[in-house]
Amino acid sequence: MRILIIKLSPIEAITSSMFRTLAIARGLSEAGHKIDYLVVPMNKLNSASSEKEFIKELNVIRTSKSEVYEKNVINAENSFKALRKQILRKIWHSLSVYDYTYLIAKKIKIDILPVREYDIVISSSDPKSSHIVVENLRKQGLRYKRWIQYWGDPLSIDITQKSIYPQWVLRLIEKKLIKNSDKIVYASPFTLSKQKELFKDYKDKMVCIPTAYMEEEIYPATDNQKFIIGYYGNYTARVRNIKPFYNACRALGDKVSVAIYGDSDVKLQATPNIAIYDRGIVDEHKRIADLLICILNSSGTQIPGKLYHLAGTNKKVLVVVDGEQQQEMREFLLSFDRFYVCGNSQEEIENAIVSIMKDNKEFLPLPELKYDYIANRFIE
C-alpha cells in the first residue's frame, strides 16, 4: 500500500511523539508499504537526535518554514529581540490552541506531495495541526481509502494546554478535528475511556494501541560499584512532580548514583550523588544504568511514551504512578509483568529502589510492544 504519514515536527527532533510515529513508519516500511512522510524543517528551538538508518527508506517531504514565526519568534539575537520572542511565544500559546505549525498547515499546497491518492493517510499529533493538514489537502483533491488519526494528548483534556479558551470551546474544536477521520488511535486505555465518554458519536471508531518502541536495546550486565539510576525526560512542575524521586535519591546518599536529564522549570540542585543535565543524548548513561525511572503525570489520563520505549530495553524500569487514577494505572502496568511500580511519595520510591537493588530478576524487551507488531495492529 501507499501510505502518507503527516507529522508537523522535524523528523530529527528528540520528542516522544516523533519517536512513536517513526516506530509506526518503520514497521509499515519494513512490511513492504511505500511511505511518504510529511514533516517540517528543523529550527533553533529543536534538539536533534542521531538519524536512524531506516529513515533513509522513507520518502521524507519537508514543508517550507513559517516565515512570520521564524522572523519574530525564532531568530531573536539581541536582548530586546529575545525578550520580544519570549513575550510573543506566550501570547501565541495563550490565544491559539495550536503551535506555530498551524500557519504551515493552513498554507500547505497539495503539489508538495508526489501523488494525490493514498491507501491510508495517518496524521499524528502532537502537534495537533497535523490533522488540519489532511482537511486542507482534502479540499485540494487529496484522496484516500482510510484516514487514521494518531493522538498523543487529546485537545480538551491536555494538561499541558495553555490556551485561554474554556473546555467547551476546546471540545468543539476537537470534535471538528476528529469527525471526518475513519479511525482514531489513542495510546492510553484511560484516555480512550475518557474520549469515548466525551465524544459518544465517534466512540465506535476510537481504539487504544500502546506506543511501540522503535528498537530493541539489549545491554550487557552491569558491574557498578554504586547502583546507577537514570531519569530521562522533561519534568515541568505542572505536568509531573519529580521532587519525591529527587528527595528519595538524596536520602539514599552514596548507595546510589543518579543522573537526571531533561528540561524543566523546576530548579534541582546537584548533589554528590545526583547529577542534573539539560535534555540531550542519553545513550551512554543508559548503557551503564542499573535502573531507569519513568514518572507519570500528576493528573490526566495519559501515559508518557517514554515508558513504552523503556520497555524495549532489558533494563529494570521503575514506574512512579501519580494522579487521580493511580490504582487503575498500577494494575494496568503490572499486567505487563515488565515494570516495577510505586506511588509518588519519597517513602514509597525509596523503599522501591532499595527492594529493586536486592532483586536479581532479569528482563527482556516486550515483544507485544515492538514496532512491527504495533504497526500491523495500527492499520488493521
What are these regions (language model features)?
Residues 43-106:
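A conserved catalytic-core segment of Leloir-type glycosyltransferases
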Residues 287-368:
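Catalytic binding pocket for nucleotide-activated donors in carbohydrate/polymer assembly enzymes
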Residues 179-204:
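A short, active-site helix/loop in glycosyltransferases that binds the activated sugar's phosphate group
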Residues 190, 211-212:
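Carbohydrate-associated surface elements
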Residues 1-65, 183, 249-252:
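N-terminal subdomain of nucleotide-sugar transferases
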Residues 214-217, 224-267, 276-280:
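Conserved catalytic-core segment of nucleotide-activated headgroup transferases in glycan assembly
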Residues 23-24, 103-106, 129, 155, ...:
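Membrane-proximal helix-turn-helix segments that form the acceptor-binding/catalytic region
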Residues 108-130, 144-148:
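Short N-terminal targeting/anchoring amphipathic segment
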